[in-house]
């Protein structure tokens, strides 16, 4: 019975774990969020974004970045993350 578990169940569970880690890594990509913060700043500086919208978006993105960094720190304990 244990041999069958080793042959059929364990590879499936490993694959699910790898897919979950990859999905979380993409979902919480800090470089993408940082790029959005830079884009928001640039649009504000060239006058394409009003100050109130800039501040609102900046706060949203900074909150997303904090969350993403926390999640990535937790993931780092599980598996090495390549940047």
UniProtKB/Swiss-Prot annotation:
Function of the molecule: Proteins GvpF to GvpM might be involved in nucleating gas vesicle formation. A minor component of the gas vesicle. Gas vesicles are hollow, gas filled proteinaceous nanostructures found in several microbial planktonic microorganisms. They allow positioning of halobacteria at the optimal depth for growth in the poorly aerated, shallow brine pools of their habitat.
Assembly information from the UniProt record: GvpF to GvpM interact with each other in vitro, and may form multi-subunit complex(es).
Main localisation: other
Family of this protein: Belongs to the gas vesicle GvpG family.
Location in the cell: Gas vesicle
Protein name per Swiss-Prot or TrEMBL: Gas vesicle protein G2
Miscellaneous note of the record: Encoded in a 14-gene locus called c-vac which produces cylindrical gas vesicles only in the stationary growth phase.
InterPro entries: Gas_vesic_GvpG_halobact, GvpG
Annotated Pfam families: GvpG
Protein keywords: Gas vesicle, Plasmid
Induction of expression: In PHH4 (a deletion of the p-vac locus) transcribed in all growth phases, maximal expression in mid-stationary phase. An unstable 6kb transcript able to cover gvpD-gvpE-gvpF-gvpG-gvpH-gvpI-gvpJ-gvpK-gvpL-gvpM is detected, as well as smaller transcripts. Gas vesicles appear earlier when grown in static culture, possibly due to O(2)-limitation.
Any GO CC annotation of this UniProt entry: gas vesicle
Isomerase among keywords: no
UniProt entry tagged with the keyword DNA-binding: no
Top-level taxonomic group: Archaea
NCBIfam families in alphabetical order: gas_vesic_GvpG
